[in-house]
């Protein structure tokens, strides 16, 4: 059994402990101590990390009554070692977890929304709510949560028998829990059963910042950050806005308007380019058809190679080539280190593009698929891809 010192003192940064066992597995060397300051991953909170006897400890997990610590090197059984926390990581995790309690209490108190899911990743924290809230409502909850932080309220841990829980005003009660339960309380605020580590006062959280929310099942998923993570995230995004402003030659507050104007200009240019491309293909298609192979029944077979071409442009040219209904055509175009192709057969032809696509895939070292009158695929780029297009025209006719 491992004594969990972090349950009584979340501010304890180190301790002396005796190595009870050490065994190698896929994750590293699994070390069990008689006591530990390291919180094992659980309850939505990330594992602590640090060192054991100077050896890097990267992950801790609870197995039964023991906490298993994964180290990069083995530790001698029976030896006393110093367990030292990566304190910055612990503080980051405490800020996120305590912030989650306070934000969850805010949406519950203000709007009756329940937190039904909590996840903490590296620089990403989410809660899932069982009802939808608007951006304005979330902003109100964010303001309320931050007011709880700035009032610097005490956060306390207590242990109570489960029979006393009905007397507490808790946002979430799990009636399946029995025995002595660990209760985390924010003064005049959230009360919740919790196994995690928390700062001593709300002021240590510093800040809660909601970044986004999305529809999730019958409610929403709220993405947020607290403390140092929130500060660094805001600093990074602020730099993005300043960079965008410099590129647009305007102040940061003008960036949204500048981007809208730029988007309108790009849309207009794309429409003009699309119109010019259509005109070009009106001229190019007859030239390509004039060079097409023709069988005894009058069906034309043509394969065109296009260097600078988008997928949409390739389809446009293909449609121009197929306009008479008696043509089998392929448009092959380069996209970076890939060669792509679109195949089509007119309604008055007997050609099956599925079969032609298999042949084209073999020719270009790739694959594709489709239906009788249209298919598409691609393969790897090679220097002789234009010569292969000439071969493809012959394959279309066979």
Regions found by a protein language model. Give the residues of each.
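Active/ligand-binding-proximal structured segments within catalytic/core domains
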Residues: 36-52, 76-127, 372-373
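Hydrophobic helix-and-loop "lid/oligomerization" segment in the mid-to-C-terminal part
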Residues: 242-337
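Functional cores that coordinate and move charged inorganic groups
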Residues: 89, 108-218
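Short beta-strand
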Residues: 59-60, 116-120, 212-213, 330-334, ...
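A generic structural motif
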Residues: 30-31, 64-73, 125-131, 341, ...
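A conserved active-site cap/scaffold subdomain adjacent to cofactor or substrate pockets
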Residues: 199, 211-258
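Conserved nucleotide-binding/hydrolysis modules and their immediate coupling elements
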Residues: 1-79
């Amino acid at each position: 059994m491992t004594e969990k010192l972090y349950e009584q003192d979340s501010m304890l940064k180190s301790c002396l402990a005796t190595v009870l066992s050490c065994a190698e597995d896929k994750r590293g060397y699994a070390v069990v101590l008689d006591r530990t300051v390291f919180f094992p991953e659980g309850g939505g909170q990330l594992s602590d990390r640090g060192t054991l006897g100077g050896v890097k400890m990267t992950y801790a997990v609870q197995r039964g009554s023991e906490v298993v610590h994964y180290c990069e090197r083995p530790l001698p059984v029976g030896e006393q070692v110093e367990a030292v926390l990566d304190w910055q990581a612990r503080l980051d995790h405490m800020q996120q977890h305590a912030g989650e309690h306070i934000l969850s209490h805010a949406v519950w108190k203000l709007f009756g929304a329940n937190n039904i899911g909590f996840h903490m990743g590296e620089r990403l924290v989410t809660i899932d709510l069982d009802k939808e809230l608007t951006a304005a409502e979330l902003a109100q909850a964010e303001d309320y949560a931050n007011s709880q932080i700035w009032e610097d309220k005490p956060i306390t841990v207590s242990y109570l028998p489960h029979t006393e829980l009905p007397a507490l005003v808790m946002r979430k009660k799990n009636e399946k829990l029995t025995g002595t339960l660990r209760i985390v309380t924010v003064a005049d605020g959230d009360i919740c059963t919790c196994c995690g580590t928390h700062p001593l006062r709300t002021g240590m959280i510093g800040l809660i910042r909601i970044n986004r929310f999305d529809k999730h099942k019958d409610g929403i998923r709220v993405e947020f950050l607290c403390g140092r993570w929130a500060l660094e995230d805001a600093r990074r995004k602020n730099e993005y806005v300043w960079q965008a402003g410099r590129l647009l030659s305007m102040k940061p507050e003008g960036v949204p308007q500048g981007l809208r104007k730029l988007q309108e200009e790009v849309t207009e240019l794309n429409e003009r380019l699309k119109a010019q491309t259509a005109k070009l293909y009106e001229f190019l298609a007859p030239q390509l058809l004039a060079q097409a192979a023709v069988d005894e029944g009058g069906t034309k077979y043509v394969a065109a190679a296009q260097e600078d071409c988008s997928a949409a442009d390739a389809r446009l040219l293909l449609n121009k080539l197929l306009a008479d209904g008696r043509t089998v055509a392929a448009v092959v175009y380069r996209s970076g280190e890939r060669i792509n192709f679109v195949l089509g057969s007119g309604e008055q032809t007997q050609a099956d593009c599925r079969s032609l696509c298999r042949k084209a895939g073999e020719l270009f070292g790739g694959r594709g698929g489709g239906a009788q009158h249209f298919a598409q695929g691609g393969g790897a780029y090679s220097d002789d891809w234009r010569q292969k297009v000439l071969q493809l025209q012959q394959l279309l006719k066979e």
